[in-house]
Design a protein with these regions (language model features):
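Conserved alpha/beta-hydrolase "acid-adjacent" motif
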Residues: 208-214
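Catalytic histidine-centered segment of alpha/beta-hydrolase-like enzymes
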Residues: 233-244
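Gly/Ala-rich beta-loop-alpha elbow adjacent to hydrolase catalytic centers
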Residues: 83-87, 91
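Active-site loop/oxyanion-hole signature of alpha/beta-hydrolase fold enzymes
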Residues: 41-82, 244
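Flexible "cap/lid" loop of the alpha/beta hydrolase fold
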Residues: 96, 102-133
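Conserved HGGG/HGGXW glycine-rich cap/lid loop of the alpha/beta-hydrolase fold
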Residues: 5-52
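Conserved alpha/beta-hydrolase catalytic His-Asp/Glu region
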Residues: 116-118, 136-191
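Short beta-strand/loop motif that positions the catalytic acidic residue
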Residues: 195, 201-203
Length: 262
């Protein structure tokens, strides 16, 4: 696992974890905007990006690696932790491991209720079509379609370049393991109730039902949680494609005890 850092190390620490199949650049734009007030840390998970040759193991394994980094580099505590999809689940696991790890947490589009059937279907699809779906040609088509159909969500050139470099080299094995662990096995732990963090749990209005159910379960077990539904949006849109909207939502949450109504 590699850690990219932005801002002065003396600033409060914020760690943001990318989604499955993507890499640290998921949160690059947010990191730059936050770095005038915060020390922002963006990990590259094993099996992703420049760490594509390392085996991805599980949510729990990733959380333990990040916990070691926090102990060694941040005096064992963060101001805030966040993540999108798989990254959000890893953030949830960090909160479950240590009730004092962070004052704030931002979860976007993550599940914490096992979905074994969905995991099996996704695994079959990625085993059959993964090499085609993540080929350089397919990635180019995806980027050009994004520009034409959703110009407000298109990546800038810098992130397009990272996308074109990292997506085609993501091992199919990484994706299969993510579906099996993130989707098929991970269950919210009872220790989450002990977490002292104030949590903002975001999901898109058009997300799968299991994401919305996960947010409800999380809030039930950890009442210091505001659930925010991003109207008209699908999975992870604010974190991955709309950094300015993410900042508009998250900045007040970081700076105050402002609660957003869903």
């Amino acid at each position: 696992m590699i850690f990219h850092e932005f801002g002065d190390k003396k600033f409060p620490h914020i760690l943001l974890i990318h989604g499955g199949g993507n890499s640290w650049w998921n949160y690059l734009r947010q990191a730059r905007m936050l770095s005038d007030k915060y020390h922002v840390i963006l990990p590259t998970l094993d099996g992703h990006g420049e760490e594509y040759q390392k085996e991805y193991i599980s949510t729990e394994n990733s959380a333990h690696q990040i916990m070691d980094y926090i102990k060694n580099n941040c005096n064992g505590k963060l101001f805030a932790v966040g993540g999108v999809s798989l990254g959000g689940q890893i953030a949830i696991e960090l909160l479950s491991l240590n009730n004092d790890i962070a004052q704030k947490a931002i979860i976007d589009g993550s599940i914490c209720i096992p979905q074994p059937r969905l995991a099996r279907v996704s695994t079959i699809i990625v085993k059959l079509f993964g090499k085609l779906m993540f080929s350089k040609y397919a990635c180019k088509i995806q980027l050009s379609l994004m520009k034409k159909m959703f110009p407000n969500m298109a990546y800038p050139k810098e992130i397009e370049d990272y996308y074109m470099e990292d997506m085609p080299r993501t091992p199919i094995k990484t994706l299969v393991t993510i579906y099996q662990t993130y989707m098929g096995e991970y269950r919210l732990k009872y220790s989450i109730a002990e977490s002292k963090a104030q949590v903002l749990y975001i999901y898109g209005e058009k997300e799968m039902g299991c994401v919305k159910e996960s947010a409800k379960l999380f809030q039930k077990m950890h009442p210091n949680c505001t659930v925010y539904e991003a109207k008209g949006y699908n999975h992870g849109y604010l974190s991955v494609y709309l950094p300015l909207e993410w900042m508009d939502l998250v900045n007040p949450f970081l700076e105050n005890d402002v609660h957003h109504n869903s």
